[in-house]
From Swiss-Prot:
Annotated compartments: Secreted
Name of the protein in its database record: Uncharacterized protein DDB_G0273449/DDB_G0273577
Keyword field contains Secreted: yes
Secreted keyword on record: yes
Organism: Dictyostelium discoideum
Keywords on record: Glycoprotein, Secreted, Signal
Residues carrying covalently attached carbohydrate according to the record: N37, N63, N86, N118, N146, N165, N178, N194
């Protein structure tokens, strides 16, 4: 009996140690990604302005280094974030190196904006309201994707055709009736065709604030798509599944938003604009990606927390509690 009791105590100790070092208590560690905190402050005058030059515009997409590179799980990749204010003209970038198939979290400080939104005098400055609402975010990944365009055109077709078996077929089209020489007559028909070209992977801009509904997108989720280790696409989760917004206070460009007044932020820390990164598909070694199961829209299925309130900045929010890693290129 004492032996069984001892085994039970040992199992409890092991469970407790794993829990303390696990995601729920300490937050995701290296195996679940790394938070890049404080890289950029929204509205900060000290961030380099890159103008309207997109990163991928400088890359030769025919170069195989941008199209043929393949990743295994835990390899370092690259993504560049852009934040722009369409009213003030402020623009900045931040680079991040997420590890393949890790659920990664990136935070940008938005304290000043959130404090402004929570001012008691809600309409003190119309231009300031528009300036805050003018913030947009987008992202670039230094790889290309195949984009197929479907279109149609009018083509001339002979009214009379000779088939391979020697038989002659005459079209019943109106243009082929009452013609002088059926052998030279033609009619027009619509021909559908498609063409495939390489285009850079650029996620479209999304707004962060909306004053008409007094809502704010507190987090964005990006899904990377792997095909045998090659990054072939990336998409905003809200664009991937538009039903996500049905349980939110509002939808801003298909992204789930919550009301300003409902934002619960850590005292002295404020709210952070967050980007969650996850992976789908198969890596270079043929392993299926599993980090997709950790995104908020998936997690919502097993949580009592409303999806609109996930990641609002609470101390207990395990999305943030990340351990430092000296070998992480994001800290270099």
């Amino acid at each position: 009996m004492k032996f069984i009791y001892s085994i039970f105590i040992i199992i409890q100790i092991i469970f407790f140690i794993n829990l303390i070092n696990g995601q729920i208590v300490r937050g995701p560690d290296l195996q679940l990604g790394y938070v890049e905190n404080g890289t950029m402050l929204l509205g900060s005058p000290n961030v380099v302005n890159i103008g309207d030059q997109n990163f991928m515009n400088t890359k030769d997409l025919s170069n195989s280094s941008w199209t043929d590179h393949r990743y295994n799980r835990y390899d370092w990749s690259f993504i560049r974030f852009h934040i722009r204010n369409n009213q003030s003209g402020f623009e900045a970038t931040a680079d991040f190196h997420p590890r393949v198939d890790e659920f990664s979290t990136i935070k940008f400080s938005a304290n000043g904006l959130i404090q402004y939104l929570n001012e008691t005098n809600k309409n003190r400055n119309v231009f300031k309201n528009r300036e805050v609402e003018g913030y947009t975010v987008w992202a670039e990944i230094p790889y290309s994707k195949n984009v197929t365009s479907f279109t149609s055109r009018l083509v001339d077709v002979p009214c009379q055709e000779t088939l391979t078996n020697g038989s002659v077929v005459v079209s019943t089209d109106k243009a082929c009736q009452n013609v002088t020489d059926i052998t030279t007559a033609t009619y027009q028909k619509v021909e559908n065709y498609n063409s495939t070209v390489l285009e850079p992977i650029i996620l479209p801009p999304k707004h962060i604030f909306e004053f008409s509904t007094r809502t704010f997108v507190s987090y964005f989720t990006i899904i990377f798509q792997l095909d045998n280790g090659a990054i072939v696409d990336a998409v905003w989760d809200g664009d991937r599944d538009t039903s996500i917004c049905k349980n939110c206070d509002s939808c801003i460009d298909n992204q789930c938003a919550t009301k300003f007044d409902d934002m619960r932020c850590d005292e002295g820390v404020g709210c952070q604009l967050k980007f969650f990164l996850a992976w789908a598909g198969v890596d270079k070694s043929g392993k299926n990606c599993v980090s997709l199961n950790k995104i908020p829209s998936k997690f919502q299925k097993y949580s009592a927390t409303a999806i609109k309130n996930m990641g609002t900045g609470l101390v207990s929010d395990f999305f943030y509690k990340i351990n430092d890693n000296n070998n992480n290129p994001n800290t270099a």
